[in-house]
Amino acid sequence: MSKTIIIGNWKMNKTFTQTKEFFSAFNQLYIENKNKINQNLDFAVALPAINVAAFSKNTTKLELAVQNMSQFEKGAYTGEISAQMLLDLNVKYAIIGHSERRQYFKETDLDVNAKTQQAIKNNIIPVVCVGETLEEYEAQKTSQVIEYQLKNSLKDVDLSKVIVAYEPIWAIGTGKTATPEQAQQVCKFIRKQTNKNLTILYGGSVSQENIEQLLNQADINGALVGGASLKVDSFIKLLTLNK
Protein backbone atom coordinates (compact mmCIF):
# COMPACT_ATOMS: atom_id res chain seq x y z
CA MET A 1 0.00 0.00 0.00
CA SER A 2 1.38 3.41 -0.96
CA LYS A 3 1.76 6.11 1.65
CA THR A 4 -0.74 8.90 2.11
CA ILE A 5 0.96 12.29 2.39
CA ILE A 6 -0.34 15.52 3.90
CA ILE A 7 1.82 18.64 3.61
CA GLY A 8 0.90 21.93 5.22
CA ASN A 9 2.01 25.01 3.28
CA TRP A 10 2.35 27.93 5.69
CA LYS A 11 3.18 30.43 2.94
CA MET A 12 4.44 33.76 4.41
CA ASN A 13 3.02 33.26 7.89
CA LYS A 14 4.39 32.94 11.45
CA THR A 15 7.50 34.43 13.01
CA PHE A 16 10.32 32.29 14.40
CA THR A 17 8.82 32.63 17.89
CA GLN A 18 5.34 31.71 16.68
CA THR A 19 6.77 28.69 14.89
CA LYS A 20 8.42 27.43 18.07
CA GLU A 21 5.13 27.92 19.90
CA PHE A 22 3.32 25.92 17.21
CA PHE A 23 5.68 22.96 17.60
CA SER A 24 5.46 23.07 21.38
CA ALA A 25 1.66 22.82 21.19
CA PHE A 26 1.76 20.31 18.33
CA ASN A 27 4.04 17.94 20.24
CA GLN A 28 1.49 17.70 23.06
CA LEU A 29 -1.60 17.44 20.89
CA TYR A 30 0.08 14.82 18.71
CA ILE A 31 0.63 12.60 21.76
CA GLU A 32 -3.03 12.94 22.71
CA ASN A 33 -4.22 12.03 19.18
CA LYS A 34 -1.49 9.64 18.04
CA ASN A 35 -3.75 6.58 18.06
CA LYS A 36 -6.21 8.30 15.69
CA ILE A 37 -3.56 8.91 13.02
CA ASN A 38 -3.16 6.23 10.36
CA GLN A 39 0.29 4.66 10.56
CA ASN A 40 0.43 4.74 6.76
CA LEU A 41 0.32 8.55 6.81
CA ASP A 42 3.36 10.76 6.23
CA PHE A 43 2.95 14.42 7.11
CA ALA A 44 5.02 17.58 6.92
CA VAL A 45 4.87 21.36 7.16
CA ALA A 46 6.48 23.69 4.63
CA LEU A 47 7.88 26.58 6.64
CA PRO A 48 9.20 29.96 5.54
CA ALA A 49 12.92 29.30 5.08
CA ILE A 50 13.92 31.65 7.90
CA ASN A 51 11.97 29.49 10.38
CA VAL A 52 13.40 26.11 9.40
CA ALA A 53 15.76 26.06 12.40
CA ALA A 54 12.73 26.15 14.72
CA PHE A 55 11.87 22.65 13.50
CA SER A 56 14.35 21.29 16.06
CA LYS A 57 11.53 21.81 18.59
CA ASN A 58 9.49 19.10 16.85
CA THR A 59 9.58 15.72 18.62
CA THR A 60 7.02 13.83 16.50
CA LYS A 61 6.87 12.02 13.15
CA LEU A 62 6.26 15.38 11.47
CA GLU A 63 8.66 15.97 8.56
CA LEU A 64 10.16 19.25 7.34
CA ALA A 65 9.37 20.85 3.99
CA VAL A 66 10.14 24.19 2.35
CA GLN A 67 8.11 26.33 -0.03
CA ASN A 68 10.81 27.04 -2.60
CA MET A 69 14.49 26.46 -3.37
CA SER A 70 17.11 27.62 -5.82
CA GLN A 71 17.59 26.11 -9.24
CA PHE A 72 21.33 26.72 -8.81
CA GLU A 73 23.72 24.47 -6.90
CA LYS A 74 25.83 27.23 -5.29
CA GLY A 75 27.63 30.45 -6.10
CA ALA A 76 26.94 34.14 -6.64
CA TYR A 77 23.14 34.07 -6.45
CA THR A 78 22.31 36.64 -3.79
CA GLY A 79 19.30 35.75 -1.66
CA GLU A 80 19.00 32.18 -2.93
CA ILE A 81 18.91 29.01 -0.81
CA SER A 82 20.36 25.85 -2.30
CA ALA A 83 19.18 22.27 -2.03
CA GLN A 84 22.45 21.37 -0.29
CA MET A 85 21.75 23.94 2.43
CA LEU A 86 18.25 22.57 2.92
CA LEU A 87 19.39 18.96 3.02
CA ASP A 88 21.87 19.85 5.76
CA LEU A 89 18.87 21.00 7.82
CA ASN A 90 17.05 17.68 7.23
CA VAL A 91 14.49 19.07 4.80
CA LYS A 92 12.60 16.16 3.19
CA TYR A 93 10.24 17.92 0.74
CA ALA A 94 10.41 21.07 -1.39
CA ILE A 95 7.29 22.62 -2.91
CA ILE A 96 8.22 23.72 -6.42
CA GLY A 97 6.25 25.79 -8.91
CA HIS A 98 3.39 26.79 -6.64
CA SER A 99 0.94 29.01 -8.51
CA GLU A 100 1.87 31.98 -6.32
CA ARG A 101 5.51 31.58 -7.33
CA ARG A 102 4.47 31.39 -10.97
CA GLN A 103 2.12 34.37 -10.68
CA TYR A 104 4.04 36.82 -8.49
CA PHE A 105 7.64 35.84 -9.26
CA LYS A 106 7.16 34.84 -12.90
CA GLU A 107 8.52 31.31 -12.47
CA THR A 108 8.27 29.30 -15.66
CA ASP A 109 8.03 25.59 -16.33
CA LEU A 110 11.72 25.78 -17.26
CA ASP A 111 12.52 27.17 -13.80
CA VAL A 112 10.37 24.50 -12.18
CA ASN A 113 12.17 21.78 -14.12
CA ALA A 114 15.60 23.09 -13.09
CA LYS A 115 14.58 23.26 -9.42
CA THR A 116 13.09 19.78 -9.59
CA GLN A 117 16.32 18.40 -11.01
CA GLN A 118 18.31 20.10 -8.23
CA ALA A 119 16.04 18.72 -5.54
CA ILE A 120 16.33 15.15 -6.81
CA LYS A 121 20.09 15.48 -7.20
CA ASN A 122 20.30 16.38 -3.51
CA ASN A 123 17.85 13.75 -2.22
CA ILE A 124 15.03 16.17 -1.51
CA ILE A 125 11.58 15.12 -2.72
CA PRO A 126 10.14 17.77 -5.05
CA VAL A 127 6.42 18.49 -4.82
CA VAL A 128 5.73 19.92 -8.27
CA CYS A 129 2.57 22.01 -8.49
CA VAL A 130 0.31 22.22 -11.52
CA GLY A 131 -3.09 23.81 -11.96
CA GLU A 132 -5.36 25.94 -14.11
CA THR A 133 -6.74 29.45 -13.65
CA LEU A 134 -10.45 30.22 -13.40
CA GLU A 135 -10.43 31.48 -16.99
CA GLU A 136 -8.79 28.28 -18.24
CA TYR A 137 -11.20 26.17 -16.19
CA GLU A 138 -14.26 27.97 -17.54
CA ALA A 139 -12.88 27.66 -21.09
CA GLN A 140 -12.60 23.88 -20.52
CA LYS A 141 -8.83 23.98 -21.05
CA THR A 142 -7.90 22.17 -17.83
CA SER A 143 -6.49 19.05 -19.51
CA GLN A 144 -4.58 21.08 -22.08
CA VAL A 145 -3.00 23.32 -19.43
CA ILE A 146 -2.10 20.44 -17.10
CA GLU A 147 -0.60 18.38 -19.91
CA TYR A 148 1.60 21.31 -20.98
CA GLN A 149 2.78 21.97 -17.42
CA LEU A 150 3.59 18.31 -16.81
CA LYS A 151 5.44 17.92 -20.10
CA ASN A 152 7.72 20.89 -19.45
CA SER A 153 8.07 20.85 -15.67
CA LEU A 154 8.90 17.13 -15.55
CA LYS A 155 11.08 16.88 -18.65
CA ASP A 156 13.87 14.30 -18.09
CA VAL A 157 12.75 13.80 -14.48
CA ASP A 158 12.71 10.39 -12.75
CA LEU A 159 9.02 10.16 -11.85
CA SER A 160 9.71 7.67 -9.08
CA LYS A 161 11.39 10.51 -7.16
CA VAL A 162 8.78 13.22 -7.54
CA ILE A 163 5.35 14.13 -6.17
CA VAL A 164 2.84 16.11 -8.24
CA ALA A 165 0.32 18.38 -6.53
CA TYR A 166 -2.77 19.42 -8.44
CA GLU A 167 -4.01 22.80 -7.23
CA PRO A 168 -6.74 24.46 -9.28
CA ILE A 169 -5.73 28.10 -8.95
CA TRP A 170 -9.34 29.18 -8.66
CA ALA A 171 -9.64 27.14 -5.45
CA ILE A 172 -6.54 28.40 -3.61
CA GLY A 173 -7.46 30.53 -0.61
CA THR A 174 -10.88 31.33 -2.05
CA GLY A 175 -13.02 28.99 0.01
CA LYS A 176 -13.99 27.32 -3.25
CA THR A 177 -12.91 23.77 -3.84
CA ALA A 178 -13.19 21.28 -6.61
CA THR A 179 -15.62 18.53 -5.70
CA PRO A 180 -13.92 15.23 -4.86
CA GLU A 181 -15.15 13.94 -8.21
CA GLN A 182 -13.70 16.92 -10.10
CA ALA A 183 -10.39 16.56 -8.30
CA GLN A 184 -10.33 12.84 -9.02
CA GLN A 185 -10.97 13.42 -12.71
CA VAL A 186 -7.94 15.70 -13.07
CA CYS A 187 -5.69 13.55 -10.86
CA LYS A 188 -6.62 10.52 -12.96
CA PHE A 189 -5.61 12.50 -16.05
CA ILE A 190 -2.28 13.39 -14.39
CA ARG A 191 -1.60 9.73 -13.64
CA LYS A 192 -2.41 8.79 -17.23
CA GLN A 193 0.03 11.42 -18.49
CA THR A 194 2.84 10.37 -16.14
CA ASN A 195 3.18 7.11 -14.24
CA LYS A 196 0.71 4.72 -12.63
CA ASN A 197 2.76 4.74 -9.42
CA LEU A 198 3.12 8.52 -9.17
CA THR A 199 2.16 10.11 -5.85
CA ILE A 200 -0.47 12.78 -6.51
CA LEU A 201 -1.69 15.34 -3.98
CA TYR A 202 -4.71 17.62 -4.21
CA GLY A 203 -4.59 21.18 -2.93
CA GLY A 204 -7.07 24.03 -2.92
CA SER A 205 -9.14 24.96 0.16
CA VAL A 206 -8.60 21.55 1.76
CA SER A 207 -10.22 21.42 5.20
CA GLN A 208 -11.10 18.96 7.94
CA GLU A 209 -14.59 18.84 6.45
CA ASN A 210 -13.58 17.64 2.98
CA ILE A 211 -10.23 15.88 3.41
CA GLU A 212 -11.62 12.39 3.99
CA GLN A 213 -13.77 12.52 0.86
CA LEU A 214 -10.81 13.76 -1.17
CA LEU A 215 -8.49 11.04 0.11
CA ASN A 216 -11.09 8.38 -0.69
CA GLN A 217 -10.64 9.09 -4.41
CA ALA A 218 -8.68 6.44 -6.32
CA ASP A 219 -6.04 8.75 -7.78
CA ILE A 220 -5.54 11.15 -4.87
CA ASN A 221 -2.72 10.06 -2.56
CA GLY A 222 -2.67 13.03 -0.23
CA ALA A 223 -3.23 16.73 0.25
CA LEU A 224 -1.35 20.01 0.07
CA VAL A 225 -3.03 22.19 2.69
CA GLY A 226 -2.86 25.94 3.19
CA GLY A 227 -4.74 27.86 5.88
CA ALA A 228 -5.97 24.77 7.75
CA SER A 229 -2.36 23.86 8.59
CA LEU A 230 -1.62 27.12 10.44
CA LYS A 231 -3.47 26.22 13.63
CA VAL A 232 -2.41 23.24 15.68
CA ASP A 233 -5.91 21.93 16.37
CA SER A 234 -7.10 22.14 12.76
CA PHE A 235 -3.88 20.54 11.47
CA ILE A 236 -4.29 17.65 13.90
CA LYS A 237 -7.89 17.28 12.70
CA LEU A 238 -6.56 16.90 9.16
CA LEU A 239 -4.15 14.17 10.25
CA THR A 240 -6.88 12.25 12.08
CA LEU A 241 -9.32 12.82 9.21
CA ASN A 242 -11.53 14.83 11.57
CA LYS A 243 -11.88 12.01 14.12
From Swiss-Prot:
Query: What is catalyzed by this enzyme?
Result: D-glyceraldehyde 3-phosphate = dihydroxyacetone phosphate
Q: Which SUPFAM superfamilies match?
A: Triosephosphate isomerase (TIM) (SSF51351)
This protein's GO cellular component annotations are: cytosol
Gene3D superfamilies linked: Aldolase class I
The positions flagged as active site in the entry are 98 (electrophile), 167 (proton acceptor)
- InterPro entries to which the protein is assigned, alphabetical: Aldolase_TIM, TIM_sf, TrioseP_Isoase_bac/euk, Triosephosphate_isomerase, Triosephosphate_isomerase_AS
Q: Name one Pfam family in it.
A: TIM
- Cell compartment(s), UniProt: Cytoplasm
Set out the biological process GO terms recorded for this chain's protein.
gluconeogenesis; glyceraldehyde-3-phosphate biosynthetic process; glycerol catabolic process; glycolytic process
Entry binding sites for substrate = 9-11, 173, 205, 226-227
Q: CDD domains annotated for this entry?
A: TIM (cd00311)
Identify the keywords attached in UniProt to this record, alphabetized.
Cytoplasm, Gluconeogenesis, Glycolysis, Isomerase
The pathway is: Carbohydrate biosynthesis; gluconeogenesis; Carbohydrate degradation; glycolysis; D-glyceraldehyde 3-phosphate from glycerone phosphate: step 1/1
Look up the domain of life of the source.
Bacteria
MF terms from GO for this chain are: triose-phosphate isomerase activity
> EC?
5.3.1.1
What family is it from?
Belongs to the triosephosphate isomerase family.
Q: What does this protein do?
A: Involved in the gluconeogenesis. Catalyzes stereospecifically the conversion of dihydroxyacetone phosphate (DHAP) to D-glyceraldehyde-3-phosphate (G3P).
Q: Which NCBIfam families match?
A: tim (TIGR00419)
Tell me the subunit arrangement: Homodimer.
PANTHER family (alphabetical): TRIOSEPHOSPHATE ISOMERASE
Its protein name is Triosephosphate isomerase
| Naturally occurring in which organism (per UniProt) | Mesomycoplasma hyorhinis (Mycoplasma hyorhinis)
